[in-house]
Amino acid sequence: MLNIFSLICLNSALHSSSFFFAKLPEAYAFFNPIVDVMPVIPVLFFLLALVWQAAVSFR
């Protein structure tokens, strides 16, 4: 079971590393600034939730 799990993790890590370094086709080159910001969006939602909870005194 552990071998299957490690194989899945290793396989996804190899695919994701090549995915991060892929370039957009020339027709979509104007989306590059948006694509660069997209990985930060979940962090912004986390910070929004933290500020919201601070505003309501962490009820």
Swiss-Prot record:
It is found in: Plastid, Chloroplast thylakoid membrane. The keyword Lipid metabolism does not apply. It is a single-pass membrane protein. InterPro entries: PSII_PsbK, PSII_PsbK_sf. Its main location: plastid. It comes from the Eukaryota. GO terms for cellular component: chloroplast thylakoid membrane; photosystem II reaction center. Keywords: Chloroplast, Membrane, Photosynthesis, Photosystem II, Plastid, Reaction center, Thylakoid, Transmembrane, Transmembrane helix. One of the components of the core complex of photosystem II (PSII). PSII is a light-driven water:plastoquinone oxidoreductase that uses light energy to abstract electrons from H(2)O, generating O(2) and a proton gradient subsequently used for ATP formation. It consists of a core antenna complex that captures photons, and an electron transfer chain that converts photonic excitation into a charge separation. This is Photosystem II reaction center protein K. It comes from Calycanthus floridus var. glaucus (Eastern sweetshrub). The lineage of its organism: Eukaryota, Viridiplantae, Streptophyta, Embryophyta, Tracheophyta. The gene is psbK.
